[in-house]
Amino acid sequence: TRFSTVTGVQTCALPISTKGLEFMFSPDFSVFKGSGWVGILATAGGQVFFSLSLGMAAMITYGSYLSKQESLVKNSIIVPICDTIVALMAGLAVMPAVFAMGMEPAGGPGLLFVTLQAVFNDMGTLGPVFGFLMYFLVFIAAITSSISLIEGVASAYIDSKVAKGQSYNRKAIVGIVSALLFIENLPTCLNALGMPGGHLANIGKFCWLDFYDLLAEGIMMPLGSLILAIIVGYKLKAEWVESEVSLEGNSFAGRSFWMFCFKVTAPIGMALVLAGQLDAFFALGLFN
């Protein structure tokens, strides 16, 4: 948090940095014209999936480790608020620098490894120090994110063994899952984002990173979330949800609101996100 604050102050002090602040906080409602709102919804949905680790079993897995005394309703409010605050701090550390350096406000590796590096270069003798700290923290973030992904798969397999009354070796399971994920992600390294010098060809019109992004953000996450919302809203129903949320005397505040979200808002929203993601990736023209 302190590092983001220092970086944010530095970037906001750059020339023309106010354009970055305008980009972040001045809404452009013209993007909602026609079918534009679908694209905005799809983009926001993709951000939510990755930022909050939704649709990938991470939240469910970590949630199952919570003490029964914890309020699920309270935690479901605190987590998104804290995530939004951190995202805003990260935006303040990056977006002013994007415009100050005359770059396009795009996302992805270029924003992280090109734009931010330009900021550190402008910081003089402290630049290399802050640059090292920044990319070290990015490395730590990647490792901790990988842990959450591995934990979801590993715990599901362990739970299946426990349900059958079989023994298991957690270290071996985690090692196997980690090795499989490492092998699965090798193509993204060998492909080099589809640029010259890569050792692996693109898959169709997509580089391997975009292809995995399509599978994860474009299909699996919204589809899985859609199915889960339907299961919770229509198969498990309100009584089961309330029995879980109300453990140890916790109150199910906003019960009607949450169930409306499960039954109506979430399924419709996830269906639109799924359609919007597929439309964006394949230029299907579904909403033209």
PLM feature spans:
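Single conserved hydrophobic/aromatic residue that forms the stacking wall/gate
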Residues: 1-12
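Membrane-embedded translocation segments of transport machinery
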Residues: 13-147, 161-173
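Hydrophobic alpha-helical transmembrane segments of multi-pass small-molecule transporters/permeases
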Residues: 44-48, 80, 132-142, 178, ...
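Transmembrane alpha-helical segments in integral membrane proteins
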Residues: 53-68, 139-155, 225-242, 281
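Transmembrane helix-loop boundary segments of multi-pass membrane transporters
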Residues: 74, 105-114, 130-138, 156-172, ...
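Membrane-embedded alpha-helical segments of transport systems
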Residues: 81-90, 180-187, 220-224
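C-terminal membrane-solvent junction of multi-pass transporters and transport-like membrane proteins
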Residues: 154, 161-178, 211-270
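Alpha-helical transmembrane segments and their membrane-interface junctions
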Residues: 184-192, 269-284
